Amino acid sequence: KTFDRDLIKKLEISDHILISIPPINGKDIVIKYFGEVIKECNPKWVTYLSATSVYGDHKGEWVNEESETNPKSKSGIGRLEAEKSWITFTANSKLLFQIFRLSGIYSNQKNILVRLKSGNVNLINKKNQFFSRIHVEDIANVLFKSLSNFKSGEIYNISDDKPSSPEEVTLY
């Protein structure tokens, strides 16, 4: 596959690389198409944005970075496979690397109020189903702070620390 030469040139001079592209068919395409370029530019900061869906169903129990990963959804399985690919790739390349597992992302344009106004809401009430959320501005702040406080090899959950049921969020 060929890519815009300007994109390759920009990658070659990058010292910070943020991977936010989700896996396609369970595989990370960034390593596939740009791995060698990333390895050669030897960035001082490589961060992969994953998702808390890698944990799967913990029956209402809270999870943290040490919790067992056992994804059931296609996207969660793909994210975990991508994480493993990046961990192996960066270890073999001796690149500094971290993972941020993002919870349910919302913004001013994507949130329950927008869905309520559009009539695109299903009130879900499942026993022991909780999820946390994170605003896009909070994600940006975490990424910015990690530029100067980078710890290679770490995995961080990025969420609001207020797990709620889908019903609670909708009724709020």
Residue ranges and their predicted role:
Residues 33-74:
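Conserved Rossmann-fold NAD(P)-dependent oxidoreductase catalytic core, especially the SDR/UDP-sugar
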Residues 1-8:
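Glycine-rich, highly charged phosphate/nucleotide-binding loops
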Residues 59-99:
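Catalytic helix-loop patch of NAD(P)-dependent Rossmann-fold dehydrogenases
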Residues 142, 149-172:
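Mid/C-terminal beta-alpha module of Rossmann-like enzyme folds, strongest
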Residues 4, 25-27, 55:
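Short glycine-rich, flexible loops that bind phosphorylated cofactors or substrates
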Residues 8-48, 84:
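NAD(P)-cofactor binding segment of oxidoreductase domains
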Residues 87-131, 136:
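NAD(P)-dependent short-chain dehydrogenase/reductase
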Residues 18, 47, 98-100, 156:
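Hydrophobic/aromatic beta-strand patches that form the interior of the parallel beta-sheet core
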